[in-house]
């Protein structure tokens, strides 16, 4: 299967938020072993742990890409693009560790993830606008891109919500979502993003602050509009 050559900005747009999400899993699984961050050696906390997490994330991203591309679920990158993917994944894994130890880093990460999600949504809207033209039918490749986009959107929203929740924990304020800690927080954030974007909203997890309500409203409207467009494009060819 021939690889696809992509420039670095497009690889960042398509993969950074996904890589950032999977990079949260190793620290979450190991967090019970280190309940007090202050007791961890500084060089281990600020350099060794982020570097190790970056390497793990890079390997995970490469394996995910190879596994799903062999089943035509996603893009298979050529050699040069895979090196860029590894670099993006390493940076995402390196940065994700700081979300638990630095307020400033958490702010920066939240802004980066939000900006990348915005660019990805904008690029996706530009693409599906072409499929809204008369007599244009969605192909299997388009449907695969829809699925990739939807998963990326869910994980991007989960990361944004987790970052906002973490900021409030740093300041000792009331958590805007109260996802919990560690692996439970990740699971709850993904669950909440799914029911928000699909506009199900069971009400077991709710936003508690004005900022959280604004974020959730934006996520809900984004999911509602884009899901409607995607379903309309797909069913038009049936």
Located regions from the model:
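Outer-pore turret/helix-boundary of cation channels
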Residues: 30-50, 148-191
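Alpha-helical transmembrane segments
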Residues: 13-28
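Alpha-helical transmembrane segments of polytopic integral membrane proteins
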Residues: 61, 65, 114, 118-122, ...
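Physicochemical signature of membrane-embedded alpha-helices that form the seven-helix bundle of GPCRs
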Residues: 44-52, 144, 215-219
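Transmembrane alpha-helical insertion/packing segments
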Residues: 28-120
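Pore domain of cation channels
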Residues: 21, 181-238
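Pore-domain transmembrane helices of cation channels
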Residues: 107-108, 120-171
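Cytoplasmic membrane-interface regions of multi-pass membrane proteins
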Residues: 1-7, 59-75, 124-139
């Amino acid at each position: 299967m021939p690889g696809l050559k992509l420039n670095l900005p497009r690889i960042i747009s398509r993969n950074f938020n996904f890589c950032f999400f999977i990079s949260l899993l190793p620290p979450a699984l190991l967090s019970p072993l280190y309940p007090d961050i202050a007791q961890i050696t500084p060089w281990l906390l600020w350099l060794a742990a982020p570097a190790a997490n970056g390497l793990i994330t890079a390997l995970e991203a490469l394996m995910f890409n190879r596994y799903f591309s062999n089943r035509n679920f996603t893009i298979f990158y050529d050699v040069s693009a895979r090196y860029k993917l590894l670099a993006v994944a390493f940076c995402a894994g390196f940065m994700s560790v700081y979300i638990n130890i630095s307020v400033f880093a958490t702010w920066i990460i939240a802004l980066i993830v939000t900006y990348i999600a915005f660019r990805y949504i904008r690029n996706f809207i530009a693409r599906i606008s072409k499929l809204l033209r008369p007599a244009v039918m969605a192909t299997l490749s388009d449907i695969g891109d829809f699925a990739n986009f939807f998963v990326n959107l869910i994980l991007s929203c989960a990361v944004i919500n987790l970052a906002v929740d973490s900021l409030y924990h740093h300041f000792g304020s009331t958590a805007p979502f109260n996802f919990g800690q560690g692996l439970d927080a990740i699971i709850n954030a993904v669950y909440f993003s799914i029911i928000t974007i699909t506009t199900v909203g069971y009400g077991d997890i709710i936003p508690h602050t004005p900022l959280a309500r604004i974020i959730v409203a934006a996520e809900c409207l984004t999911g509602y509009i884009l899901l409607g467009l995607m379903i309309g494009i797909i069913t038009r060819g049936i």
